[in-house]
A protein has these predicted regions:
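Conserved pre-motif I regulatory segment
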Residues: 214-254
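Accessory nucleic-acid engagement/destabilization modules that flank
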Residues: 1-213
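Walker A/P-loop NTP-binding motif
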Residues: 262-279, 297, 419-422
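Walker A/P-loop
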Residues: 247-269, 404, 408
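Inter-Walker segment of RecA-like/P-loop motor cores
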Residues: 307-384
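SF2 helicase catalytic motif II
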Residues: 388-416, 420-422
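Conserved Walker A/P-loop ATP-binding site and its immediately adjacent core
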Residues: 279-303, 317-327
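Pre-Walker A (Motif I) flank of P-loop NTPase domains
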Residues: 246-253, 278-280, 367-369
């Protein structure tokens, strides 16, 4: 266990899981490493797959703190700390196996399928995205606002028909904490749903090609073009190509200044998102100044795009070091907080764009559906750094627009190529 967990140790001890001497040593493996070591052992024992095959799956758990444990750390956890792992205690092993089977049942995965997956191997890109998703789940589950560390209220249990009557007494507390079978699993589903509602993560944006009638209509409905304005050739051609391709990939739009490349890129991004099922758009620029200017244009685009897509709101994030000084962005944040705290408002807002309370900050902000950022935020998806998996998760479901891509030096260009390779 990490740190001093003595305050919570009574819970497993009451259920019969004794902490043997030496199981709480200061040099014991961190729980991410322990989780990978235990999962490797369980998959091997249940499927017979060799350790080199199961590691691809188990490492998804191992790197949920942002950094993958080394092979030496995992081997050391197994060989030098069997007591901390529970490997020399039948009761602990039984609980680990039961929890392992329970998770497989929830996921609907048969042991035969798990063994086949281990032998076939997990594609690294998929493993990284799954690791990022696990990090996200871990942070949500660790959120004490969403899941407060208090006794379950009586109404949470009594709200289910024929459920166990819980009054908060010590006997009931012991019964609940021991995992008594009389307590319905729906109770914990309800607790999870309440926590999810408190976190209030909006669904990702989705687009349909049915909203695109023609090139002219799309540009007219998404951008504030003057009456009678004609499309630039590059705008019409870019959207025509986007509509024609079956499998969107990389598009390079090259034209002189003032030809409407930004509008063309956003229109193409909408079509690409509809064809690939992407849930957002990321627009990256070279400087904070250009990023601030672009944010205003993207915000204006979103106010037309989101209602046309049939969604009530979409999450937006401005990612650079001085985003707190952008008045338009801060205005969106202030409006969100006003409507959250105003009990008298009628539910209608002036803006369709929202800044998520949870998807906010240097690590989680990029998870928002729509992101306007300096290009380094995208480049970090191709660099070896902590929480790389979370960064790749945030980019994996987006159409990424890199503006002014000709303006970068050798090193950024190399990183851009790596980012494009990752996104492909």
């Amino acid at each position: 266990m990490d740190g001093d967990a003595g305050s919570l140790a009574w819970i497993p001890e009451h259920a019969g899981l004794v902490f043997a001497a030496g199981s709480r040593e200061k040099n014991s493996p961190k729980h991410a490493t322990a989780g990978q070591a235990i999962l490797e052992r369980l998959i091997r024992s249940k499927t017979g797959a060799p350790v080199r095959d199961v590691r691809g799956i188990a490492s998804i758990v191992g790197c949920h703190h942002g950094k993958s444990p080394s092979s030496f750390d995992v081997r050391s956890a197994k060989e030098e700390h069997p007591t901390s792992m529970g490997f020399d205690n039948d009761t602990w092993q039984s609980v680990q196996e039961e929890l392992f089977g329970f998770c497989l049942d929830l996921a609907g995965i048969a042991l035969e399928d798990l063994g086949g997956l281990a032998r076939d191997g997990v594609v690294p890109q998929a493993a990284s995205v799954l690791s990022g998703l696990l990090i996200m789940c871990d942070w949500i589950a660790s959120n004490t606002y969403a899941f407060p560390l208090v006794l379950l209220d009586a109404y949470e249990i009594e709200s289910f028909e024929g459920s166990y009557s819980y009054d908060g007494s010590y006997e009931d507390r012991a019964l609940l904490d021991s995992g008594n079978e009389g307590i319905p699993f729906e109770l914990f589903r309800g607790r999870a749903q309440k926590g999810w509602d408190r976190v209030n993560i909006l669904p990702s944006w989705s687009e349909s090609l049915s909203v695109v009638d023609s090139c002219k209509d799309l540009y007219k409905s998404r951008f504030a073009f003057p009456e009678g304005a004609l499309l630039r050739p590059v705008q019409e051609e870019a959207l025509s190509v986007a509509l024609a391709v079956d499998e969107p990939g990389l598009m390079i739009i090259e034209a002189p200044m003032g030809e409407g490349k930004t509008e063309a890129a956003l229109a193409v991004a909408e079509v690409f998102a509809a064809k690939t099922g992407a849930g957002g758009v990321c627009v990256a620029l070279p400087t904070m100044a250009t990023t601030d200017a672009m944010f205003s244009r993207v915000h204006s685009w979103l106010e037309r795009l989101l209602p046309a897509s049939g969604v009530q709101s979409g999450t937006v994030y401005l990612a650079h070091g001085k985003a707190q000084l952008n008045e338009e962005y801060q205005g969106i944040i202030s409006e969100n907080r006003y409507h959250m705290g105003d009990m008298d408002h009628d539910g209608e807002k002036d803006s369709f764009a929202e800044v998520s309370d949870w998807m906010f900050g240097s690590k989680k902000g990029m998870l928002s559906s729509f992101v306007v950022c300096t290009v380094d935020q995208v480049l970090m998806g191709a660099l070896q750094m902590k929480h790389l998996a979370l960064r790749q998760l945030s980019l994996a479901n987006k159409v990424v627009v890199i503006d002014e891509c000709h303006a970068y030096g050798v090193t950024p260009t190399t990183c851009i190529c790596g980012s494009i390779l990752m996104l492909s």
